Amino acid sequence: MGEAAGDRVLSRLHSVRERIGDSLSAHPNELVAVFTRLVNLGKGMLQAHQIIAEYNNAISEADREKLKDGAFEDVLRSAQEGIVISPWVALAIRPRPGVWEYVRVNVSELAVELLTVPEYLQFKEQLVEEGTNNNFVLELDFEPFNASFPRPSLSKSIGNGVQFLNRHLSSKLFHDKESMYPLLNFLRAHNYKGMTMMLNDRIRSLSALQGALRKAEEHLSGLSADTPYSEFHHRFQELGLEKGWGDCAKRSQETIHLLLDLLEAPDPSTLEKFLGTIPMVFNVVIMSPHGYFAQANVLGYPDTGGQVVYILDQVRAMENEMLLRIKQQGLNITPRILIVTRLLPDATGTTCGQRLEKVLGTEHTHILRVPFRTENGIVRKWISRFEVWPYLETFTDDVAHEIAGELQANPDLIIGNYSDGNLVACLLAHKMGVTHCTIAHALEKTKYPNSDLYWKKFEDHYHFSCQFTTDLIAMNHADFIITSTFQEIAGNKDTVGQYESHMAFTMPGLYRVVHGIDVFDPKFNIVSPGADMSIYFPYSESRKRLTSLHPEIEELLYSEVDNNEHKFMLKDRNKPIIFSMARLDRVKNLTGLVELYGRNPRLQELVNLVVVCGDHGNPSKDKEEQAEFKKMFDLIEQYNLNGHIRWISAQMNRVRNGELYRYICDTKGAFVQPAFYEAFGLTVVESMTCGLPTFATAYGGPAEIIVNGVSGFHIDPYQGDKASALLVEFFEKCQEDPSHWTKISQGGLQRIEEKYTWKLYSERLMTLTGVYGFWKYVSNLERRETRRYLEMLYALKYRTMASTVPLAVEGEPSNK
């Protein structure tokens, strides 16, 4: 149900209970049939599609038309999950993103109850803890800490937090002269390693500041626009102004105008421009502990994929933006960016055992590796991202020491990546008092259905008790949160967002989250990344094409040799290629792609299939990858796909991968991303940037990247036959009309140009750091209560749970 439809339903009746009650009284026979079918499914959880399926089976189409008049179908279609404990059926109803209501229906008595969040969660817990006393359960509720701060209420405001925050700051903090003093103090506090910036001690009041600014403005008006700062810095110092206003007269004048305008008549746009202009970011630390973090020969290793690519592209763009801004601010400061990850002493063939490594394409950015350590010494083995929790506290202390040695100062911004990186970033930012940004990449709770309710079943392998607690701590501690898409935050009209799934949930026997996060919180900002344009560019740019790599690519795709690089063969080289490349894990669902291909003989007639994943020459020690590896072989044998499929080991060479995308374009093929859930979808952006028509999962970020039918296609990984039929339809249409392939290819390229570039990303990130850094400064006391609450959760829950995760047993050194 869309937002407009949701508003229509909400305005029609005042509450869920009244809407359902009205339908019950108007159509009791039909509704009894629906809920009786739900009860007959037996005790357990219901997914949204099950609820709708039973509704469609129970009620004829004619009767469903009648029910629409009573609004019951709208309500039922907005139910995201159900709980059956006879004779009760409880529903979690989501009229629109970020808005939830809970109801319980007694099928025997046709009684309807509206439930509070704790009541609904308590009822849910009965599925796993029948007969236990759950009246005294730890409930986590972060809502009181934010009660005094206004929130936007429209779904379209989600992910545009900085705009709302700017409006709030400009209206509340600057409504009179006294309220502007935090800005004055903020500017006076600016310094870098003892070097004063912006204002010196001569300016102690707002009137003195305004007077100095007007005199500086008058002085600058008599100079040519390109007069360097060095020629008027003495006059500035006499007035109380220090470095940082600009590198020349013109830029200094622009900054002064912004501040004068802000002091005279504050408005959100001027505030954002000013805070984005002043010098605030010189040292950045980016945390990404797990996996194999290096610049070559690691992609495709366990826990090593899009996040590594994202960060390496991110830091190159960030360094360029920092250098540009520092120059424009008239400062002679060398910025530093440190990517902090785990040192792996035995990762042969990679640089993962090297303490410090310069990032290629940068001047001032390095990978800093710090080992995991226990009382027995350095941990040498690779450790799954699900098992890092016992090491992170000691790791954080060691990282703090290493950062201090490298930077000789505190960082100005700490960015966490994924759950483990976000926890370390949170602990460091808390300790150092610096601005903290969170980037989740993927929140595991949404990948594994009901992994909160049945967490004990997952605990031995995944340790979700640690991970979900870590995620709650990090997202509530962060000064601002970056997501690549709206869907990451709040999903869409049909699916729940990653962060939204943390609003309310229960882990029976551990704690109950009645308010974990608010997706309307202005800390959320959508900042979409791009692809590296030097590697990923359109297939049509023939002068840039790396044709010298084509013999290697053709060997990779078509050689008849079976080896550790590639298995199985393609008999017909003239057919287009369906291509996919990802980690070999359950959620990425590459085995699902092979299965849908195997089940559709017509698709096999039309196209070949090439999948790039896993490592034939070095079997993984990751249990999930081992299972998917076996499943892949079994499916290829079951459907007799040899001759139609090529299974290539994970490819580490990004430059060649870029040309591989373009080579697939030459075959008039397509890229398919079949994940059950994908937070963003970097490979989707890469393939579209190369001009390759792309089919990608409807669950997560790709549904936002692709405009369905215009710049690519959405597929449902849970409905493989429909996905394969869509592929057949596309390739049959391309056979009839080759311009159809070109049309979709061009649509993808246009979408990328409009929305997904690293330059736009880095500009936005630097501006966000300025705005939220200022907000952190002026609201520090208000956030103290939240931080104390988080300290308690960390000390009393997380540390206890982390201590139960088994430590790695050191054996023979391993690369994977």
From Swiss-Prot:
Name residues in a coiled coil. none
Report, as the record phrases it, the tissue specificity of this protein: Expressed in root phloem and leaf mesophyll. Expressed in phloem tissues and aleurone layers of seeds and at lower levels in the pericarp and endosperm cells (at protein level). Predominantly expressed in elongating tissues including roots, developing leaves and internodes.
**UniProt cross-references to Gene3D superfamilies, sorted A to Z:** 1.20.120.1230, 3.10.450.330, Glycogen Phosphorylase B
Q: Which UniProt keywords apply?
A: Glycosyltransferase, Transferase
Annotated GO MF terms? sucrose synthase activity
GO biological-process terms attached to the record? response to carbon dioxide; sucrose metabolic process
State the EC number(s): 2.4.1.13
- Stretches the record annotates as GT-B glycosyltransferase: 280-757
InterPro entries reported in the protein's UniProt record = Glyco_trans_1 (IPR001296), Sucrose_synth_GT-B1 (IPR000368), Sucrose_synthase_pln/cyn (IPR012820), SUS_EPBD (IPR056736), SUS_N (IPR056735)
Q: Which reaction does it catalyse?
A: an NDP-alpha-D-glucose + D-fructose = a ribonucleoside 5'-diphosphate + sucrose + H(+)
Superkingdom in the source lineage? Eukaryota
Q: What induces it?
A: Up-regulated by sucrose, fructose and glucose. Up-regulated under elevated CO2 condition.
Function, as annotated: Sucrose-cleaving enzyme that provides UDP-glucose and fructose for various metabolic pathways.
Binding partners and assembly = Homotetramer or heterotetramer with SUS2.
Q: Which family does it belong to?
A: Belongs to the glycosyltransferase 1 family. Plant sucrose synthase subfamily.
This chain's protein is named: Sucrose synthase 1
The organism is: Oryza sativa subsp. japonica (Rice)
